[in-house]
Swiss-Prot record:
Induction or repression: Repressed by thiamine.
Membrane topology reported for the UniProt record: Multi-pass membrane protein
Mitochondrial intermembrane compartment segments: 32-42, 141-146, 191-203, 261-273, 325-326
Cytoplasmic side: 1-10, 64-119, 168-169, 225-239, 295-303, 348-370
Any one of the GO CC terms: fungal-type vacuole
Annotated protein name in UniProt: Thiamine-repressible mitochondrial transport protein THI74
Domain of life the protein comes from: Eukaryota
Localization of this protein: Mitochondrion membrane
Record-annotated EamA domain positions: 129-190
Keywords assigned by UniProt, alphabetized: Membrane, Mitochondrion, Transmembrane, Transmembrane helix
UniProt function note: May be involved in thiaminediphosphate transport across the mitochondrial membrane.
Main location: mitochondrion
Species of provenance: Saccharomyces cerevisiae (strain ATCC 204508 / S288c)
């Protein structure tokens, strides 16, 4: 693959990330509306529902299996039919002798692919769930803008993790970006707390802590997913991967849902009216689509680029808070956001050698299924 091809892949990844940013801010607004207003304050169930819905990605595979079984049954039926002439039998015999071998090889390859994907999905479903649960729960205590901004610190967690795994190079400029971002975050959190007279400072502390926990979890599964794909040369089938993440989430976390209901920490109940049901389903659809785009963008770009893209959720989240909550932002709040923007430019700076290294790596062969 030439450098032009690489640029095209990268551009496609960036465009997908742009869609993801819009979708994620929209999902944050919907979740915030459900949780903070107590219209449907069920962060665990919402997370469980959103991620379990990924199982629907296996529908095409299930349909192909059904069609394959039907075709196989039809072929076995046809083989039992009487053959009227020796000539027709001799023409058909080679097909019969070659079919089992070919089918066996294809089946072996397919089984290996499914097992690798299932292993990867099982490994990441817990990280995925915990990170999303923390991010959703944070919206019960803080604003969309604060949650989104704090979640964007995953870029810095990603930098350290990716550097330790050899996926990313470390530089003084990127380290400077970390400190600039930290200063901006402090300004933003302080101003967010001052704006909310009706909510205690401890609630904001809980919300901000959960947002940071979600940020750390996000950076861990993003970096490790890219590492697993790159280091082992896996050809990731995104639909199958997400599908099994949904299946494992559904199977592993339903006991916790029951425990939360029994202990009254989060009672299980369906939405009480159409409006809430609509918001819940819309949020689920947004996550369903956007996380597919996110996976594709991760493969086409890099963990750091994907996490840096969260920067652009900040102005959108601020606008969402302005529209939904009639929030106001002090000059210090805006300055904090500017600091974070500057820090991401520093962290995302790449030299020519890094670009050439990526070119060489991609030319070795694609890892993305068409």
């Amino acid at each position: 693959m030439n450098r032009v091809g690489i640029d095209v892949d990268h551009m496609i990844g960036v465009l997908l990330l742009a869609v993801v940013v819009v979708f994620w801010v929209g999902a944050s607004c919907l979740t915030n509306e459900l949780l903070e207003t107590n219209a449907y304050n069920k962060p665990f169930f919402l997370t469980y529902l959103n991620i379990s819905s990924f199982a629907l990605y296996l529908t095409p595979d299930l349909w192909r299996i059904i069609q394959s079984r039907r075709k196989s049954l039809q072929e076995r039926t046809e083989r039992t039919l009487p053959i009227h002439t020796q000539e027709s039998f001799s023409e058909f015999l080679p097909l019969l002798s070659s079919t089992p071998s070919t089918s066996s090889n294809l089946s072996s390859i397919a089984d290996t692919k499914v097992k690798d994907t299932m292993r990867l999905s099982l490994l990441f479903c817990v990280l995925w769930f915990v990170a999303n649960l923390a991010a959703n729960a944070a919206l019960s205590y803080t604003t969309v803008a604060s949650s989104t901004i704090l979640s964007s610190t995953s870029s810095f967690f990603t930098l350290f993790l990716a550097t330790s795994l050899g996926i990313e190079t470390f530089s003084t400029k990127k380290l400077l970006g970390l400190f600039v971002s930290l200063f901006g975050i402090i300004l933003i959190v302080m101003q967010s707390s001052k704006q909310q007279d009706s909510v205690s400072a401890s609630s904001f502390l809980v919300g901000n802590t959960l947002a940071l926990l979600g940020s750390l979890g996000y950076s861990v599964y993003t970096t490790l997913l890219k590492y697993e794909i790159s280091s082992k040369g896996l050809r990731l089938d995104i639909q199958m991967f997400l599908g099994y993440v949904g299946i494992f989430t559904f199977l592993l976390f339903w006991p916790i849902l029951i425990i939360l209901d029994i202990t009254h920490m989060e009672t299980f109940e369906l939405p009480s009216n159409f409006h809430i049901s609509f918001l819940v389903m819309l949020n689920c659809i947004i996550i369903f689509v956007s996380d597919y785009f996110w996976c594709k963008a991760l493969i086409l770009t890099s963990p750091l680029v994907v996490t840096v893209a969260l920067t652009f959720t900040i102005p959108l989240a601020m606008f969402a808070d302005f529209v939904w909550r009639e929030a106001f932002f002090t000059p210090w709040y805006i300055i904090g956001v500017i600091f974070i923007f500057v820090s991401f430019f520093l962290v995302n700076h790449r030299g020519e050698s890094a670009v050439e290294k990526d070119c060489a790596a991609v030319e070795k062969g694609p890892i993305l299924d068409a």
